[in-house]
Structures are given as structure tokens and as C-alpha cells.
Amino acid sequence: MKKIETGAARPETFPEQWPGQCEVFSHFEYACGIPSILYAVTTYKENGLGNVCCGAWASFPGDGGGFYALVPLPASTHTLANIRRTGEFCVNFLPVRHFDALMRTVRQNGMEDDEFTEGGFTPEPARTVGAPRIAESFLTLEC
């Protein structure tokens, strides 16, 4: 395994993916942001259809006061609107074999798309919140 080594200056091995990327974000965010396990935040859309928002970059810290899911969720997403509307969601952790299925939910995520169906996932009721869980997940946080 090759170690990533970087200093204050952005190394040439970290090319910008879009103009000005490393002016907005530090190259350290890419060097230190190790991909985590696949997860998907699930909610119901306002029309009752399933919403699946996949991710692989997050932090799940905890202390005596609680356990927290720190996930990037842009303001323009259905997911954030759904969470603001209901106050409920699930964080579903999935094996890597579900990566392609999660990518289908990214490509088919309109208001009229049931993203569980698009990804081939089985929705199941959560035990403590009104948001749906993904039955194929090996761990779900109900929030």
C-alpha cells in the first residue's frame, strides 16, 4: 500500500477536477478525507415516494451527549427539504456491492421517481421514525 504524503503546497498528483477547486477547498480535504463506508440517507418525498441520497464521505462522531452523523447535504437536495419538512430520516450503511444500485438513485432522482425502485432496494418501515429504511442495509441509524 502506498502512503499519501503531502505538505502545505498542493502536490501535482492532486490535480484540480474543476477550475479554482483548490482555491475553494484545501488539498488537505482530499488527502485527509478518506472514503468511508457507503451509506444512504432515506426519507419520503412530499408526494410519498421514496428518497435515497447516497454518500461515501462522512463522519460519525459521538460522545457522552450523543452520536452524530455529519454528512454533506447540499441545500438543493430533496433529502434536506424532506428532513426539514418531517424532521425524520434514516442513515443506511450498505456493502460495496450496492454501489451501482446507489448510482442509479443518483441518475434517477426526480420528484416522480421512487428512488428505492430505481436502485432496486427494498423499503421497510423504521422502528422509531416515519422515514423508510433500506432492508439490504446491515446497519441503520434512525434519526
Regions from the PLM with identified roles:
Residues 1-51, 59-142:
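Active-site-proximal mixed secondary-structure blocks
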Residues 55:
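Core nucleotidyl-transferase/polymerase catalytic module
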